[in-house]
């Protein structure tokens, strides 16, 4: 499961690299760039350093949430983007800080995945956020698949 997760998030990072060439907003560009860097740190380094990649990725999800709130986009799209970023941020925070109920937050990753499917139909309205949201949703899908894998293995 680990190699599947690493491959999947790496593909999302490659998609983010392609999105970097289309982004004209500096904040969205930097968020996407640092998400790609945090994924590289998490995958390419060993146990003492990879933890910092996860912390950076979680912090960038919070920054992306603030960025989404501050953007002047349609309210419906803003709510959908927040439905993607906020649960993933909370789930990763619960896991990283080893708080209780982190497994329950992983079950709620169905919300970002389903919301992302609806957002894809409105991708013309999202000029700069598609790379950010794709990487965040990929993380949510990996968490959701790990929950399903645990259910089927037990």
Q: Which residues does each predicted region cover?
A:
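Hydrophobic transmembrane alpha-helical segments in integral membrane proteins
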Residues: 1-12, 49, 53-54, 150-151
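Hydrophobic alpha-helical transmembrane segments of multi-pass membrane proteins
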Residues: 6, 30-45
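Alpha-helical transmembrane segments and their membrane-interface exit regions
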Residues: 15-16, 37-38, 59-69, 109-120
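Membrane-interfacial loop-to-transmembrane alpha-helix junctions, especially the N-terminal start
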Residues: 21-34, 73-84, 104-105, 126-136
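Membrane-interface helix caps and helix-loop-helix hairpins in membrane proteins
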Residues: 44-51, 93-102, 152-153
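Alpha-helical transmembrane-segment detector that highlights a single hydrophobic TM helix
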Residues: 47-76
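Hydrophobic alpha-helical membrane segments
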Residues: 83-90, 104-121, 138
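Juxtamembrane boundary at the C-terminal end of a transmembrane helix
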Residues: 144-154
């Amino acid at each position: 499961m680990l190699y599947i997760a690493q491959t999947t998030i790496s593909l999302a990072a490659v998609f983010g690299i392609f999105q970097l060439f289309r982004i004209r907003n500096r904040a969205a560009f930097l968020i996407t760039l640092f998400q790609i860097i945090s994924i590289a740190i998490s995958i390419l380094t060993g146990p003492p350093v990879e933890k910092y990649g996860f912390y950076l990725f979680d912090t960038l999800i919070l920054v992306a949430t603030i960025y989404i709130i501050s953007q002047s986009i349609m309210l419906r799209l803003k709510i959908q983007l927040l439905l993607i970023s906020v649960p993933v941020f909370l789930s990763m925070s619960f896991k990283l800080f080893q708080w209780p109920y982190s497994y329950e937050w992983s079950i709620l990753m169905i919300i970002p995945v389903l919301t992302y499917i609806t957002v894809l139909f409105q991708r013309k309205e999202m000029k700069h956020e598609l790379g950010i949201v794709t990487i965040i949703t990929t993380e949510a899908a990996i968490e959701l698949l790990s929950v399903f894998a645990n259910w089927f293995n037990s």
